[in-house]
């Protein structure tokens, strides 16, 4: 018997409306809609709902805010909001699998990096998902270091792998070492 994961267990972060709708169905089935709403609150605390509309190609995701009518298309909130939605949906839909996220910080302001990492790490733990994320952003790594500093219990759940073409293998920085590397300005990207 073959050991390891099959390709069916591996998911790439997708912004495709059909993929996001399928992921949303998994969220609804598991009654995890509050997690998705909480993820979007990283960028806008007033958000209180997310709705997927049936049968529409454009503007199929609407976001509601407290005391604001009507709900608005998610595109009205920018790329960062769409990215957080896609990440939170993928974490639920990839249950017991592996999620690959390229340039995880794209569209997000540096001030929300710690919260974004909290979403990813806690969501991965809840869904038993192994996440591989790439970045070229020092602010993104710094946000991960801040998360580990504020939540040392998460240190065993994260690591940074520095890949350099001149090295035969990646350099691993354990979770508890990330805050130290950031404080010492050690290049880890």
Where are these regions (language model features)?
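Short coil/turn segments at beta-strand junctions that form active-site/ligand-binding loops
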Residues: 95-96, 129
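C-terminal lobe/lid and adjacent interdomain/linker elements of RecA-like ASCE P-loop ATPase modules
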Residues: 118-189
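Phosphate-coordinating catalytic segments in nucleotide- and nucleic-acid-processing enzymes
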Residues: 1-87, 92, 98, 158-189
């Amino acid at each position: 018997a073959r050991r390891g994961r099959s390709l069916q267990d591996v998911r790439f972060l997708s912004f495709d409306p059909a993929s996001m709708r399928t992921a949303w169905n998994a969220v609804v089935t598991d009654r995890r809609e509050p997690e998705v709403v909480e993820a979007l609150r990283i960028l806008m605390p007033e958000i209180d709902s997310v709705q997927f509309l049936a049968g529409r190609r454009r503007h199929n995701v609407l976001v509601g805010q407290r005391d604001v009518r009507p709900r608005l298309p998610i595109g009205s909130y920018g790329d960062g909001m769409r990215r957080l939605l896609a990440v939170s949906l993928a974490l639920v839909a990839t249950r017991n699998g592996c999620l690959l996220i390229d340039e995880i910080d794209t569209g997000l302001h540096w001030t929300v990096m710690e919260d974004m990492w909290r979403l990813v790490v806690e969501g991965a733990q809840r869904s038993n998902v192994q996440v591989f994320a790439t970045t070229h952003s020092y602010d993104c790594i710094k946000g991960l270091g801040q998360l580990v500093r504020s939540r040392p219990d998460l240190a065993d759940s994260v690591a940074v792998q520095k890949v350099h073409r001149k090295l035969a293998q990646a350099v691993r920085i354990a979770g508890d070492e990330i805050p130290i590397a950031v404080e010492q300005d050690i290049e880890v990207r």
